[in-house]
Regions:
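Long, structured ligand/cofactor-binding scaffold of large enzymes
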Residues: 29-231, 243-246, 348-351, 359, ...
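Acidic/polar, glycine-rich intrinsically disordered N-terminal extensions of enzymes
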Residues: 1-60, 592, 600-601, 605, ...
């Protein structure tokens, strides 16, 4: 037992580090180890800088199905490997609770009609029958696994509404004993940080790190630097949580908080509702911080009661938080830096066209759109395109909105924003306004409770009058499952600069739809407004949305409800019965799900003909690497700044003519059944062919072409990335990826590391790395090398070089040397020598590399 209150300065730690301190001390294997871990946390906290490595042991793991299916494929393969080595496959079992929510596979194939929800659920079940059967097997065959069936909601919203405990006991989370402790988690989706709005410490990790955590392995991490975001004032009337989230994203991306924890403090933080806080925390990956933690207060405990948590458990949690000293906002705490934001300065906001931190306003959107369109070669705003719709023929210009989507846990978790969208729709109907006929309207509530809220408030009808019929209870447009744009715009997709407006958290190139060039994030009420405008080439601060039936112009302000109107609706319909009814059938699923049979077994019966679920090869191809070096390597792709994991491993539709499409066609799969890359993540043979296959990927070796194209440096020919990788493999040539700043930003997508590994990539040379992706690379045995002396352009690198890397020794854990020389031999015999920092940041990560990756490392620990 360690009394941390006796450690000088421990009570002055940021509240985030109080939680971390409790975790590392409680989970330490001995009192001596606990004292050492406590010292590291306290010293780092009081210094205001990042500290040494500690072992974080989350209480639970949250999965969504796109990342969860490959995790359980890996578990099943690990059981096979355990059996092959003479071990007991039952030892491969989660030690802590794991919840997987099926939320990523539903798509808005049908929209704008009363049958959309039922039709999309039916298509989802047909497309994903193999995946769903596998998940049912996993739920029956592994301990501590809960599968939430499709059609129930988004994992992060359900986590906030149902699964977050805030405080629990060891016994609750798979251990023994009744000692209280803070709820903590990791999730295989970067927006796991939504829970930070409830004061719950958690963040996104790659699937491979989540696997290790589920199997009882600690997650090594450096004690993070904690930055204070002091909020003052209150939000102005009509300003939404989404407006605040986009403002914070702009502020913190500019400040640079990658790998740091942000702690919201001050009277402004306490003025926000719990779900407003959750909206801000949800978007924390968009500026690279590990977490954005909000304070615990009376509003939190009221929210827990509202959402149906047991009253005695809530009282217990409140008493524990008070005993830990976290209910007193006046306790002086030490931070590495303090930033300030006056909430009264936040205004109505959007973000785009391709980065969530590129904030603008309704007044600035027109200029933002036109500037981006000009850069895309569509600068003639007078150009017109004849579009035939069911309501007539229209002459449209660039900026026409193809998709308007009320979607995502980012905004649907906040009941006020959901109600505001419904009230805006009601005002539009009363004024005689309607969305333009070329706009595809998507409504995807984040949970059944959110959908029930609209129904109880009498707001579902107005939304449906505008064409916003519920399409599904899942992520949908936010992750690119938008379905096809309407047929009237499809012929013009390559000629017009089309746009989307959505209430989601990401808008990367090609993410929402391959046919849409620009994507803008906004609150749900603004989505309703822009669907009526029909274009983003408009200044809604001065231009009308349309003309009312009485002949008067209708402005944006005329549509937006007041805070008092929203509050009046919430006071009538928002109560515990809403959440009780909304989650009553959470674990049951529909009739199709209930009919799926899956008998439990120690090992999975792999189907050799399956194109969805195949046994991954990681345990067979793993190479132990005590000393890393490269000779004669070539660059597979040469990329720029802000390359996202979606660029590396797309989740969207499998394009005809792509290597993945050819693979599926060779196995008798019709093109209309290709499904998406996300749905095929249980098949490594599809995914390795789909790596670097995003249609918007810009590769400097591709001769100006976009997509899965590169130059095979052995032949000089332009070919697919997959075919080039296969040629290099046949000739025994190791591969590197060359990239710019913030490589691997975006989703916590482990396939963005698994795919390159299977293509033969041994190292990534980049200007900088996003947190989760860097750890994923290490976990798969790929070495991240961060440029020290400049970027590729300033160094004179063009991607054609023959690359060699001097030896790096990992036998001691941390890389030796920490900064290594890399040599690029160019045509003509010139050599470019430059230094890279080896971004293997902890001794445990070094141990992963020496074992050939985290999966072989964990397997050896279980034998």
């Amino acid at each position: 037992m360690v009394d941390v209150s006796g450690i000088p300065g421990a009570m002055r730690l940021p509240s985030a580090l109080v939680r971390l301190l409790e975790n590392v001390v409680r989970r330490a294997p001995s009192d001596e180890a606990a004292c050492e871990a406590a010292r590291r946390v306290v010293e780092a906290g009081l210094s205001g800088e990042a500290g040494e490595e500690v072992d974080f042991m989350p209480a639970r793991v949250l999965f969504q199905d796109f990342t969860g299916v490959p995790v359980f494929c890996d578990f099943a393969a690990m059981r096979d490997a355990m059996t092959a080595r003479g071990g007991d496959p039952a030892r491969v079992n989660p030690r802590i609770p794991c919840v997987l929510v099926v939320d990523h596979s539903v798509a808005a194939d049908e929209a704008g009609c009363p049958s959309a929800l039922a039709d999309n659920l039916a298509v989802e079940a047909r497309r994903n029958a193999e995946r769903f059967a596998f998940l049912k097997w996993a739920g029956a065959s592994f301990d501590n696994v809960t599968i939430v069936p499709p059609g129930q909601g988004i994992c992060h919203q359900l986590n906030v509404e149902r699964f977050c405990e805030v405080v629990g006991t060891d016994a609750l989370w798979g251990g023994e004993g009744a000692m209280a402790c803070f709820d903590t988690l990791v999730g295989t989706d970067s927006h796991t940080t939504t829970a930070n709005g409830l004061g719950v410490m958690g963040w996104g990790v790659g699937g491979i790190e989540a696997e290790a955590a589920a199997l009882g392995q600690p997650i090594p991490m450096l004690v993070p630097r904690v930055v204070e975001l002091r909020l003052t004032g209150e939000l102005a009337p009509g300003v939404s949580a989404m407006d605040l989230a986009l403002t914070v994203a702009e502020l913190l991306r500019a400040e640079g908080v990658v790998g740091q924890v942000v702690e919201a403090t001050g009277p402004g933080a306490l003025s926000l509702s719990v779900t407003q806080r959750a909206c801000v925390s949800n978007m924390c990956p968009e500026y690279g911080s590990t977490a954005v933690l909000f304070p615990m207060d009376g509003k939190l405990f009221d929210y827990l009661r509202l959402t149906g948590r047991d009253g005695a458990e809530v009282a217990f949690a409140e008493a524990y938080v008070r005993a830990q000293g976290l209910l007193d906002p006046e306790v002086p705490r030490v931070y590495g830096k303090t930033l300030e934001l006056d909430l009264a300065s936040v205004g109505t906001s959007l973000a785009g066209p391709s980065r969530p931190h590129n904030r603008t306003t309704p007044a600035g959107l027109k200029g933002r759109f036109e500037g981006a369109a000009a850069r895309n070669g569509h600068g003639d705003m007078a150009e017109r395109f004849t579009v035939e719709t069911g309501e007539g023929t229209f002459e449209l210009g660039h900026g026409a909105i193809a998709i308007a989507a009320i979607t995502s846990c980012t905004t649907a978790t906040d009941a006020a924003m959901v109600v505001a969208a419904g009230l805006a729709a009601r005002r539009a109907v009363e004024a005689g306004l309607a969305p333009k006929p070329w706009v595809k309207k998507v409504l995807a509530p984040g949970s059944r409770a959110a959908g029930l809220l609209l129904e109880r408030a009498g707001l579902r009808g107005p939304l449906e009058r505008l064409g916003f019929y519920t399409c599904g209870y899942g992520c949908m447009s936010c992750i690119g499952n938008s379905g096809e744009i309407l047929g009237c715009l499809k012929p013009w997709a390559s000629s017009m600069e089309l746009a989307s407006v959505l209430s989601g958290n990401r808008n990367f190139d090609g993410r929402i739809s391959p046919d849409v060039a620009q994507n803008y994030l906004a609150s749900p009420a603004l989505v309703v407004a822009y669907s009526i405008a029909g274009t983003v080439d408009v200044d809604l601060s001065v231009e009308p949305l349309g003309t009312a039936a009485c002949g008067s112009p209708v402005m944006l302000a005329d549509l937006m409800p007041t805070d008092e109107e929203v509050a009046a609706v919430l006071s009538e319909v928002l109560d515990a019965s809403l959440y009780e009814e909304g989650t009553a059938s959470l674990m049951e699923g529909d009739a199709t799900w209930r009919l799926i049979e899956a008998a439990p077994s120690a090992t999975f019966p792999w189907d050799p003909d399956s194109t969805y679920i195949r046994r991954p090869p990681y345990f067979e191809i793993a190479e132990a690497c005590r000393t890393f070096s490269l000779e004669g390597a070539r660059c597979l792709v040469d990329l720029g700044d802000f390359v996202t994991t979606d660029h590396i491993s797309p989740a969207g539709a499998i394009a005809a003519g792509s290597p993945a499409a050819a693979y599926l066609e060779d196995r008798g799969v019709d093109p209309d059944r290709f499904n998406t890359y996300g749905a095929r993540r249980g098949n490594h043979e599809v995914m390795e062919r789909g790596t670097f296959a995003n249609v918007k990927l810009e590769n400097r070796l591709a001769g100006g072409e976009r997509g899965c194209v590169t130059r095979d440096l052995l032949t000089g020919d332009l070919t697919s990335v997959w075919d080039a990788a296969e040629d290099y493999r046949a000739h025994g040539v190791p591969l590197v990826v060359l990239a710019g700043r913030m490589y691997g930003s975006g989703s916590s997508r482990d396939w963005a590391a698994k795919g390159p590994l299977l293509q033969g990539v041994r190292a990534v040379v980049a200007g900088s790395f996003e947190r989760i992706h860097r750890s994923n690379l290490v976990g798969m045995g790929i070495v991240p090398l961060e440029l020290v002396d400049g970027d590729a352009a300033s160094l004179g690198l063009d991607g054609s070089e023959v690359i060699s890397v001097d030896p790096v020794d990992f036998s001691g854990g941390l890389p030796d040397p920490a900064v290594v020389w890399v040599h690029g031999l160019q045509r003509g015999g010139k050599t470019v020598d430059f230094r890279c920092r080896v971004r293997v940041d902890t001794p445990t990560e070094g141990a992963y590399l020496t074992a050939g990756g985290i999966l072989p490392y964990v397997l050896e620990s279980l034998l």
